[in-house]
Amino acid sequence: MSAIEVTADAASTWDWPLQHNDGVVKVHNTKEKFEVGLDVQFFTPKEIEVKVSGQELLIHCRHETRSDNHGTVAREINRAYKLPDDVDVSTVKSHLATRGVLTITASKKA
């Protein structure tokens, strides 16, 4: 299993927020590339883990904060995607935009 580094935009750029009808996850599978877009606006790059295991893309996000003496508030997302057979797993890259969208892309095999 190999971990994929999550890069992030600097906070100096601003973009329109996602619209309500955009959904939480977008998956695009074209002849040229495979791409997943995931809304992770409540997580920092250090709280996001992206891995490839065989032909499976694994995404784990975890944010934990203590709110008071009575308990803990935590947010966690786990996603797994079967990569198409024609995806070159060595090209998987992830990027976190300032608006909170994690985009994971991979090229197709030639």
UniProtKB/Swiss-Prot annotation:
Q: Which Pfam families match?
A: HSP20
Under CDD domains, the record lists:
metazoan_ACD
User: Gene3D superfamilies recorded for this chain?
Assistant: 2.60.40.790
- Kindly indicate whether the keyword Manganese belongs to this entry: no
Q: Which residues form the sHSP domain?
A: 15-110
Task: Enumerate the transmembrane spans.
Answer: none
Name of protein: Heat shock protein Hsp-12.2
Protein species of origin: Caenorhabditis elegans
